[in-house]
Amino acid sequence: MNVLVTGANGYIGLRLIPQLLELGYSVIAMVRNKNRFPIHNFESWKQQLVVMEGDFLKPESLPATDTLPPIDAAYYLLHSMGAGKNFPEQEQSCAENFIGWLKPSPLGQVVYLGGISPHGSELSDHLESRATVARVLATGSAPLTTLRASIIVGSGSASFEIIRDLVEKLPVMSTPKWTRTKCQPIAIRNVIGYLLGVIEPTKKHHFFNGTFDIGGPQLLTYQMMLEGYAEVRGLKRFILPVPFLSPKLSAYWLYFMTATSFPLARALVSSLHIETTCEESRITELIPQELLSYQESIELALSVVAQNRVPSVWFNSLASGNVDSRHMRNIQIPEHGVLQDSRETTLAATRQEVIDAVWSLGGKTGWPSMDWAWHLRGIMDKCVGGSGIRRGRRDPKQLSTGDALDFWRVILA
């Protein structure tokens, strides 16, 4: 069974692909930049995995469909929420180009992971865009399965990392009114379970042309999620609700207090006043699995972080994670017309120790010279709309092309 995964370098894609391969599926991973895909993590499945390059915002960059095998299922995991104010237009264009690209090819099923958008409520640009993408995908010839998720909790997810940033760093929080909004957080493990279940050959016909809400076993407010994290960590935190923080001020609060970018903070805040609880739960009967509680999700995420086994993080998945091809063309040091200055020094360390030290730069390790100046540089970066130094790095010892490294982006590793 051949499965196409778009957004394969994203937060969900990098967690879904190993599970698909483990189950014996042949996977076509579609990415914008092959250099960013961690192919070294898939050595044992290299016979089942093909990585293809293409940008759905640039239809001319997509590979010819006659090079594709018949596709039994295609996961649509693309989003542009971190791209700025024009992300709704970008998301619609991506969906239209996806449908147009696969139109000549036999396709058994499309699976789309979106967000819960309550009927009868005025939607934010973020949630309206998610609903628009679903409508565009439904115009294709293949049956569409739409999964609508509430807040996804897992190591490296935007929601988990924002909550962790706030609770770990702020003993006292003055929180906006939207922290009393209800949601139904779901563990990333359960999300992957549902994504796998809807293409299972003996069950998939139950999900054709259907929309299914997925959530965890608890209804919580965002304040309860902050308090729940503090309880798991054994931290005393005081939360003081403030009714007068505007959406713009709330976005700035998230931006300066966490590692999130301002476009993402603005998009998130615009949706956080809307309740995202499941309106139906049919999928729990069709795909039975043990749903982790919010506390269990946090404990599992913290365990993965502590063991340095985080396979993907949200800030490596945004549009900014794509390395411009112009940078790649200029990666080689020129041989002519430059002054070459070569220096040597003797170190009381083995070759491997030196290599490990270089690959561990940044993040919690910091920088070996004038570390305070790098932190000052991070503050300056944050003040002009950059990411600052808070996002650190995905793994303390490993780097891949496209990874975030404090306020840097790795262009070759």
Model region roles, listed by residue range:
Residues Y25-N33:
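Conserved glycine-rich Rossmann-like NAD(P)H-binding loop of the short-chain dehydrogenase/reductase
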Residues P104-Q109, S141-A142:
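A short helix->loop->beta-strand "cap" motif at the edges of active sites that frequently abuts
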Residues V338-L339, T346-A413:
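Glycine-rich portal/gate segments that line the openings of hydrophobic small-molecule binding cavities
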Residues L245-H336, V384, G388, D395-Q398:
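A hydrophobic C-terminal alpha-helical subdomain
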Residues N35, E43-S105, G115-G120:
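NAD(P)H-binding glycine-rich loop region in Rossmannoid oxidoreductase-like domains
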